[in-house]
C-alpha cells in the first residue's frame, strides 16, 4: 500500500537541506545518508548519494529516471552467493 497523495512524498528534511545548499553553491560532493526510506526528488538529479545498506555506504548517482523511487531501492541489503553446487558425495551415492 502506497503513501497517501494528500500527504505527498516523504524525504528526510536534513537530506533535502544539504542538497539545496549544494545546488546553490554548485558543489558536487558525495552525501552520506542512512535514510533509505526517502523519496528521490527532482532537486537530487546529478548528485551522488551514499546510501547505507546495513554494512557500508553504496554510492548512487541520481538520474532523471529515478525520480519518485526510494533511495533504498538502489542499495541492496542482501548478497546472494548462489545455491550450493553438486558435490562428489551426492553424485557417488546414486
Swiss-Prot record:
Query: What is a single molecular function from GO for this protein?
Result: structural constituent of ribosome
Which BP terms does GO give this entry?
A: ribosomal small subunit assembly; translation
InterPro entries assigned to the protein according to its UniProt record, in alphabetical order: Ribosomal_uS19, Ribosomal_uS19_bac-type, Ribosomal_uS19_CS, Ribosomal_uS19_SF
Q: Which domain of life is it from?
A: Bacteria
GO CC, one annotated term = small ribosomal subunit
What keywords sit in the KW lines?
A: Ribonucleoprotein, Ribosomal protein, RNA-binding, rRNA-binding
Q: Which Pfam families does the protein's record reference?
A: Ribosomal_S19
Q: Which Gene3D superfamilies match?
A: 30s Ribosomal Protein S19, Chain A (3.30.860.10)
Q: What job does this protein perform?
A: Protein S19 forms a complex with S13 that binds strongly to the 16S ribosomal RNA.
What HAMAP family does UniProt report for this protein, alphabetically?
Ribosomal_uS19
The family classification in the record reads: Belongs to the universal ribosomal protein uS19 family.
Q: What is this protein called?
A: Small ribosomal subunit protein uS19
Organism listed in the record:
Syntrophomonas wolfei subsp. wolfei (strain DSM 2245B / Goettingen)
Gene this protein is translated from: rpsS
Amino acid at each position: 500500500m502506497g503513501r497517501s497523495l494528500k500527504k505527498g512524498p516523504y524525504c528526510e528534511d536534513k537530506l533535502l537541506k544539504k542538497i539545496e545548499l549544494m545546488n546553490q553553491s554548485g558543489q558536487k560532493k558525495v552525501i552520506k545518508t542512512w535514510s533509505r526510506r526517502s523519496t528521490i526528488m527532482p532537486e537530487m538529479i546529478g548528485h551522488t548519494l551514499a546510501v547505507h545498506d546495513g554494512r557500508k555506504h553504496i554510492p548512487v548517482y541520481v538520474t532523471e529516471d529515478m525520480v519518485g523511487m526510494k533511495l533504498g531501492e538502489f542499495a541492496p541489503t542482501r548478497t546472494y552467493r548462489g545455491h550450493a553446487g553438486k558435490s562428489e558425495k551426492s553424485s557417488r551415492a546414486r
